[in-house]
Amino acid sequence: MYEYLDRRYALALYKIAEEKGKVEEYLEELKDVTDIINNDTQFLEFIEHPEISTAEKKKTFINVFKGKISEDILSFLLILIDKGRINQLYSKLKEMGKIYLENHNTVIATVKTVIPLEDDERETLTEKLRRKFNKEVLIKEELDPEIIGGVYVEVNNMVIDGTVKSKLSEMKKIMLKGEQR
């Protein structure tokens, strides 16, 4: 529901970062701030507490982050506090990361296997995906013993399922269909 807003905030910050040639730096700073917030339960409770005023939250953010992050990122955080959206900072970071990848003609492929891919398998898969999507491909590997064997690939919500588990499931459906006749 809020993806549109997340994207608007992220795009606004991305444009500022791009103008200043600091996209990677700003992404890293946002990631660091997000990690600090998510890993400190007291800080997270503080920013989510409804009885703590916006002014107090902004003052705290200025005290904690001023001089440690860029003024643009600090201003961005203060705007999110004003708008009551600071607790969705991770969503903004994720959207900004997507915008960065789009602008660099790159996609992320989530690849699930039972055992880690060998270097040559990873290179072959990357090259095939690069040709299929006509984009640079970053492989994000995940181990998943439930797929039994084979490979499961997801790119931009498109799935390529070459797993043993899916083949067994297909065979089961065919066999059950045959019994019903």
From Swiss-Prot:
Listed GO CC annotations: plasma membrane; proton-transporting ATP synthase complex
Keywords: ATP synthesis, Cell membrane, CF(1), Hydrogen ion transport, Ion transport, Membrane, Transport
Top-level taxonomic group: Bacteria
Bridged cysteine pairs (disulfide): none
Localization terms from the record: Cell membrane
Keyword Oxidoreductase: no
Membrane topology value: Peripheral membrane protein
Gene Ontology MF term list: proton-transporting ATP synthase activity, rotational mechanism
Pfam families listed in its UniProt record: OSCP
UniProt xrefs under HAMAP family: ATP_synth_delta_bact
Oligomer and partners: F-type ATPases have 2 components, F(1) - the catalytic core - and F(0) - the membrane proton channel. F(1) has five subunits: alpha(3), beta(3), gamma(1), delta(1), epsilon(1). F(0) has three main subunits: a(1), b(2) and c(10-14). The alpha and beta chains form an alternating ring which encloses part of the gamma chain. F(1) is attached to F(0) by a central stalk formed by the gamma and epsilon chains, while a peripheral stalk is formed by the delta and b chains.
Similarity-based family: Belongs to the ATPase delta chain family.
Record-linked NCBIfam families: ATP_synt_delta, PRK05758.2-4
Role noted for this protein: F(1)F(0) ATP synthase produces ATP from ADP in the presence of a proton or sodium gradient. F-type ATPases consist of two structural domains, F(1) containing the extramembraneous catalytic core and F(0) containing the membrane proton channel, linked together by a central stalk and a peripheral stalk. During catalysis, ATP synthesis in the catalytic domain of F(1) is coupled via a rotary mechanism of the central stalk subunits to proton translocation.
Protein name per Swiss-Prot or TrEMBL: ATP synthase subunit delta
Species whose genome carries this gene: Clostridium kluyveri (strain ATCC 8527 / DSM 555 / NBRC 12016 / NCIMB 10680 / K1)
GN (gene name): atpH
